[in-house]
Design a protein with these regions (language model features):
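Short, charged beta-turn/beta-strand-edge "cap" motif at the junction between a beta-strand
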Residues: 36-42
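Short, compositionally biased
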Residues: 43-60
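Short, structured beta-strand/loop micro-motifs enriched in basic residues and often containing a Trp
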Residues: 8-18
């Protein structure tokens, strides 16, 4: 595992499983830089995202998902937006 600089994380809304629109106004295709724009992301979604982001940042992987990627849903059952977190390494 590379113990150097931590990768950047990009979070993108990729789908919606619930019947209602997002209360925070997020739409499919919205994308955020975790380091500079995380304050724009719904707190409920961030609560779900943080463990995935932490694992990606430190080189972990998830069963059934590509390396450097984590897909998860927000915890609002009425909305259930699907998010994709991606590890972005500087060249």
């Amino acid at each position: 595992m590379n113990r150097g600089k931590r990768p950047k994380i990009r979070i993108t809304v990729t789908g919606r499983l619930g019947k209602m629109g997002c209360h925070r106004g997020h739409k499919i295709g919205d994308s955020f830089d975790y380091d500079t724009e995380r304050g724009l992301i719904c707190p409920m979604a961030m609560h779900c995202a943080f463990p995935y982001i932490d694992i990606l940042r430190y080189g972990g992987t998830f069963p059934g998902q590509k390396e450097g990627v984590a897909e998860f849903c927000c915890s609002d059952a009425d909305v259930a937006l699907v998010f994709r977190a991606e590890s972005i390494r500087d060249e």
